[in-house]
């Protein structure tokens, strides 16, 4: 009987042997170039970047010089991308045509003449944004680029008719 218990005990010890195996798991992510436009209201259809508002006044020939407008700094659109991503910004001629560096605001009143205006890339209004000419750049290491638009109406020789003058631009950003 002692022999049977010893043999049975050895079976329990031999049956409790554990086997082990080691495996590897590769972990990875592929970061691709991409961008997203932030800082503007979201809605259905075409996104709205903001309003270039030249304000109100009876004349456009005042002693203070040209009228200026800029997208509001509180909501200025910005392109966020992987660093070193190339991008282009293009602004069309608007609803009322535009040639070279000049675009036009059209009045709602009958017989109102269009008012010429120009767009610029900088607050000093020295670097123009010509009609349908792409402006190229590269995203800096910060991964963020402001997309400012500045406008200017030069003093007019004629007093314009009373009206609300407006234009609608299409801004295309590609990367």
Model features per residue range: what roles?
Residues 113-118, 129:
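Extracellular/luminal ectodomains and secreted, surface-exposed scaffolds of diverse proteins
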Residues 92-94, 118-122:
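Predominantly extracellular/luminal cell-surface or secreted proteins
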Residues 1-7:
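Bacterial N-terminal signal peptides that target proteins for export
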Residues 7-10, 119, 167:
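Sec-dependent N-terminal signal peptides
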Residues 15-18:
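N-terminal signal peptide c-region/cleavage motif recognized by signal peptidases
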Residues 123-125, 175:
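Solvent-exposed strand-loop boundary residues in beta-sheet-rich modules
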Residues 125-132:
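Short beta-strand and strand-turn-strand segments in soluble, beta-rich domains
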